[in-house]
Amino acid sequence: MAPAASASASAVVTPSSFRCVPTASCGLGARGKAPAPRRLLHDHAQGKKRAAATWSLKAGLWDSLRSGFLKSNNSTETVEPPSAPIEEEEPLPEELVLLERTLADGSTEQIIFSSAGDVNVYDLQALCDKVGWPRRPLTKIAASLRNSYLVATLHSVTMPSKAEGEERKQLIGMARATSDHAFNATIWDVLVDPSYQGQGLGKALMEKVIRTLLQRDISNITLFADNKVVDFYKNLGFEADPQGIKGMFWYPRF
């Protein structure tokens, strides 16, 4: 899919395994004769003591490594041992009514924002057609939605004035963001149905997307904008080429 539209643009050591290496003290006397039982028991006990002492020393070293105390330049730095990975909590989707109005035929229309990512690829393709974006394979559209960190939508929901009428739901806007889930996010594919433009819905959609990312502790937010919408994004707080940083692109040359 087309971009939103230039960018307001850081050893686990495990104890060794031990094995017995045959030596003169392992129990065989000169010329292969077996030692006396008492000597055998004595040697066996001594061997066990030495093995226990060796294991104790190595285990002690392992424990000291695991405790995370590393001495360097006469200072002590505490290094916590790696903990079990914590599963990331799935953010709860948000849904709210941005606008409600009564139409000429008496029906009621609501414009609903949602961050649940509920998008029908055929509806999205139809919306892209309305704004003049080139068509992309539906499988790739579906993959882009599935792999996005956040997919926000605007739907028009029309409720008839008569009880027997059917509710109509139409996709009129969308924006999505990809992210490393920690520091950075990039906003893509911001679009609003032309018949709903000029009503502040695009601004409301973007403000909700930005707020949602900030609530998830992601504050480095970028996007790509063509010349026609640069001022729109500047009014939302985006800055072009901040501190001389340039967005760079690589395209295949074949």
From Swiss-Prot:
Primary subcellular site in the record, as a coarse category: plastid
A GO MF label: N-acetyltransferase activity
Listed GO biological process terms: circadian rhythm; defense response to fungus; melatonin biosynthetic process; mucilage biosynthetic process involved in seed coat development; negative regulation of seed germination; photosynthetic state transition; protein quality control for misfolded or incompletely synthesized proteins; regulation of anthocyanin metabolic process
A GO cellular component annotation in the UniProt record: cytoplasm
Temperature dependence: Optimum temperature is 55 degrees Celsius.
Protein name: Serotonin N-acetyltransferase 1, chloroplastic
Organism: Oryza sativa subsp. japonica
Targeting signal (transit peptide) range: 1-74
Function: Catalyzes the N-acetylation of serotonin into N-acetylserotonin, the penultimate step in the synthesis of melatonin. Catalyzes in vitro the N-acetylation of tryptamine to produce N-acetyltryptamine, 5-methoxytryptamine to produce melatonin and tyramine to produce N-acetyltyramine.
Domain of life: Eukaryota
